[in-house]
Amino acid sequence: MKLSNRSVICTAALFAGLASALTPRHNSASSLKHRRAPVQSRRVQSLLINVDAQPDLPTVEAATAAASAASLNLDDIQGDVLIGMKKNQELFYFFSIANATDFKPKLASDILPLITTTTQLLSVNTQPTTALNVAFSQTGLTALGVTDALGDSAYAGGQFSDLKNLGDPGSTNWVPQFTGTGIHGVFLFASDTEDNIDAAVASLEAALGDCITKVYTLQGAARPGTEAGHEHFGYLDGISNPAVDGFVTSPMPGQAVVAAGTVLLGESGDTVTRPTWAKDGSFLVFRQLAQLVPEFDKFLTDNAVVEPGVLTPQQGSDLLGARMIGRWKSGAPVDLAPLFDDPALGADPTRNNNFTFVHPDAALATNQTRCPFSAHIRKTRPRADLGTPEDAVHHIMRAGIPYGPEVSDDEAAANTTSTERGLAFVSYQANIGNGFRFLQKTWADNANFVHAGTGVDPIIGALAGAQRVVSGLDPTDSTKTLTLTTDFVVSRGGEYFFTPSLSAISGTLAV
């Protein structure tokens, strides 16, 4: 890993490093459709990772047919919005607009031709060397002279003013650059090597010159080897993203199917009045979430589930972690594998999401022998707990990536984090109040959801630094509570952005 101005130290505001990159593809023209001519193949392998346990992306042909039937234009939607957590390397480049008069024409001439669409990402033949997307904060749109309200109060106020709704204990732990509203936008670079991303960044910086100012960067990467697709605690991630109508044609069993307007503004299912130009854009929530992995592992060891003659101490530790998450590290849900991991189940996308928490031999409202009410995946997607069919309003498209190095031997031995690592959390939704913020505030942070006395989500639940108590983690005694003495996930801040369609950039933001 390169250590430069991107390296991250847990106790300071030095930043993380790993990578992504970009190459110009075509010349701009008057028509968006004709400007984005077919790209000559330059790849022999995808810039995306392929994790067997995650639902496959649709083929170009299938997605195009589905989009046509739903009147979606995948050539106008930025690629990261619908693709999900399949990036190999990714760099988040946060910037402010120093000179809007100079930036706007360059947005049209230098940035827009490089933006990677959904269609392009679906095939190796059309993927660029490095994918590029861009999104703007409310202050960024204001700097560009865009005064239309987008109909989302959380976005309009910015994440820093939303601290209390997220359970953050003030901004003490925040990266200083995220405090206030000084970040106007973010470039997302994605590729399969650091060198590609570094080249792309250098090229874009040269083109934009001093009309923007780099504020902060955070570099992420899929974890190495068999850990690809797993977050730093070790659990397989990205399994439960919904299937968006008009994009996914064959949802996996148990995969939630949501209207396009759950993610995209102005589409079917979006009930808020929006400016016409905002159609097919999406609100991007970015959160830098540090993970205290050695401390988490020590907690599991010290509080392992005890079943003499059934579980070894290590198995008891693994079971506690699985019940806190709601899945084993393989991705197998504890609702289907309640006592021991089942890697074959975890690796099978036709089975690893096919559950509702309903079992004929157990009362849904009281039984926690399989999956605790407080488990992370149950808190954030309650499934049958809220009745059937499942309410799809509060679904989000998650598109984050791990950042920071693997745990060192010294950290593991000391049970203490010395170098920051975590998740660069990204979610897309058409309504932050119904999406990310609802999941965090109303479900994860609510000690009385799904039922009174459940406790907070033991992974992401936050109470502004106050002590967190969780129940149901011991399968032999669901009334037993466990006090979490450490926040194993620490918010380092973030911002709310709007990811516009390509036509919105050319027709509104860049004029």
Identify the role of each PLM range:
Residues M1-L3:
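N-terminal secretory signal peptides that target proteins for export/translocation
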Residues N5-A21:
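Cleavable N-terminal signal peptides of Sec/SRP-targeted secreted and luminal proteins
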Residues L22-V511:
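Long, low-complexity, Ser/Thr/Gly/Pro-rich intrinsically disordered segments that act as flexible linkers
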